[in-house]
């Protein structure tokens, strides 16, 4: 009987096992919802067996609109035979490396003819172990352990008692975007481990398109056994009796802050994202050092700063071809720290223009109206206009502003959900997708602690007659207090580790970068309104900021008419009402699969003639 490694967690999962046979190798695929499992048998040699397809299909959720199309984008069918060949190839390489390379050397990445790239320093015998003579590496069991926003993760168990992780990105973007993302992510993980001393899963090899033996873009890496740090994170836990923060709460913040401190320890000579030198070659241009002072000859020239791979520059940009997109991606000089803000606005405006043109030509299936796209264009162009004026490198009002403007490594998923802690207590930072190099003053707080609501530092002192309030009101204030506390713990940890950078969390500095952060964190089409809101708030305080030396220009670069401000206020209120009144608006219509199926059974979700689903709120209890 096959048991799924994730069934006991109560989530949808899939496992697949290969049984050795002198004649054939049948595959046993297990899919389960909660604790129930079904077995499906298929021949390993039959790649076209439809029974196998279920193992590759997306299953962790459904969409109210365009469900079939969204799931089709997330199919991760790959060649099991090709994967087996790749595994045997890296083991063969390890034998050759043992004869030709000293174990303390760090060879350059090996770009192979079959379009996979191996990292030789991770594929030595000390890393992989050995295979018995005349034995081949075989995958004997596979489990789908995660279906994320951008990629799917499989665990591979082999006949040599070693497990691997296979990561396959969803085909949500154009091929050239996925290619750049993978190249940059692997290079950034390599840099984080070799140069910053951060524990990351060893990457053995990767392929950036479907022309390799796996027939999908992929990353093959080390499997890390342990527990997610998120298991120790309870953001709404009560303080201890002495009013000090809970020990587990503080421990999680400090562990994540330790990782951030290592990421921030290096100052770079440019702005963009990291790549291996061979992955970003510019003929005729002199190679620039990524950072100063490298003495290890194996690391000299290993990496280069290339176009940014930050998510805001590629997310939902499929209407822009490679040439159109590349104009906005950099890399940029360290002497132009605000170019990244300007180009964030420009690329979003260009994307909105292209989407609008398709909509006007009746050639777009998107469920977005022309008015929204037109107003997006104005918002993003306004951001591009304001961007270069946000910070003055010569100000003395912001302490250590020159340090804040220096490019440093930014990790968008610095989160307990992205950290595994081994049994020995060693934390590993997992997913580096979308990492970039940009001024620290433009880094936003990690989502697990970020809080921009009303600040409450002491319930008794900050809330008049707190003890007289009814329980429901107390609960609201307690929520605000705990969110304030968590953000304060994070800021305090930054101050302890990098006190020269603490000015970045000062309220005026946060307000100055807020339009940019709203653009970076935008998830839906309507959230351009949050960019507008931040730009309008800046307009209201710009004169005060100028008089106090925070900004260089006396006049705010934008003007807003009374009619514009009134329309914005109405639109913003309507947006918030939409979030409240329309279930699942905040997740863009995505619903976890177990909940989706239960809502259908309860008659709350009803399928319409166009295959979309409607929420029948009248059926809610």
Curated annotation (Swiss-Prot):
UniProt transit peptide range: 1-40
Entry coiled-coil feature ranges: none
Highest taxon listed in the record's lineage: Eukaryota
Entry GO terms, CC: mitochondrion
InterPro entries registered for this protein in UniProt: Kinase-like_dom_sf, Mito_inheritance_9
Keywords: Mitochondrion, Transit peptide
Primary localisation category: mitochondrion
Compartment annotation: Mitochondrion
Similarity comment text for this entry: Belongs to the AIM9 family.
Protein name: Altered inheritance of mitochondria protein 9, mitochondrial
Organism per entry: Zygosaccharomyces rouxii (strain ATCC 2623 / CBS 732 / NBRC 1130 / NCYC 568 / NRRL Y-229)
Gene: AIM9
